[in-house]
Amino acid sequence: MTDTWLIVGLGNPGTEYSNNRHNVGQMVLDELARRVGGSFKVHKARAHVLEGRLGIGGPRVVLAKPMSYMNVSGGPVSALSKFYDIDPEHVVAVHDEIDIPFNTVKLKIGGGEGGHNGLRDISKALATKDYLRVRVGVGRPPGRMDTADFVLKDFATTEKKDLPFLLDDAADAVETVVREGLAAAQQKYHTAVQ
């Protein structure tokens, strides 16, 4: 297997979804693409892909935004991991997380999917839950609002001013985990004042 990392930003395709909370993973990938340099190209695995390094001499990464809907992300992720010969331990899924407050980033490996159908599909396709997750907090829906309706809406006006900072923090978390490991990233992002 290779030392390359597959970094996957989860979301839904199409401009009507591009600013939704559910697409925050793909927004983070756009920030990482800016850092890597270059532009995404269509890959036969049904994903937009950018290959490069995170910094000079940094780890080799494949940034990927599946062209499928969120809930069926597993096929493209599995196909890319096979194409690039990447073990699940080197797969990082960047996704929205309603159980974490907005403007917060958490990391973990394995465990449950917390009702996140995109993660569930990736776990099924990879035949393991043991891949890394960068969980980008979008908060819980207000009142009795349906969770699906909440994540399929754009960020609130009050959140939009802080969104660039959240995307930057999440991209930094991805860089930390691939450069220094999960423990270092968790120490930084689970104990830091956000």
Swiss-Prot record:
Keywords from the named record: Cytoplasm, Hydrolase, RNA-binding, tRNA-binding
Assembly with partners or alone: Monomer.
Pfam families in alphabetical order: Pept_tRNA_hydro
E.C. designation(s): 3.1.1.29
UniProt protein name: Peptidyl-tRNA hydrolase
Annotated tRNA binding sites: Y17, Y69, N71, N117
Keyword Hydrolase: yes
UniProt cross-references to InterPro entries, sorted A to Z: Pept_tRNA_hydro, Pept_tRNA_hydro_CS, Pept_tRNA_hydro_sf
Organism from which the protein derives: Arthrobacter sp. (strain FB24)
Purpose of the protein: Hydrolyzes ribosome-free peptidyl-tRNAs (with 1 or more amino acids incorporated), which drop off the ribosome during protein synthesis, or as a result of ribosome stalling. Catalyzes the release of premature peptidyl moieties from peptidyl-tRNA molecules trapped in stalled 50S ribosomal subunits, and thus maintains levels of free tRNAs and 50S ribosomes.
A GO term from the CC aspect: cytoplasm
Source lineage: Bacteria, Bacillati, Actinomycetota, Actinomycetes, Micrococcales
EC category: hydrolase
Site (Discriminates between blocked and unblocked aminoacyl-tRNA): N12
Subcellular localization(s) per the UniProt record: Cytoplasm
Tagged with keyword Methyltransferase: no
Family affiliation: Belongs to the PTH family.
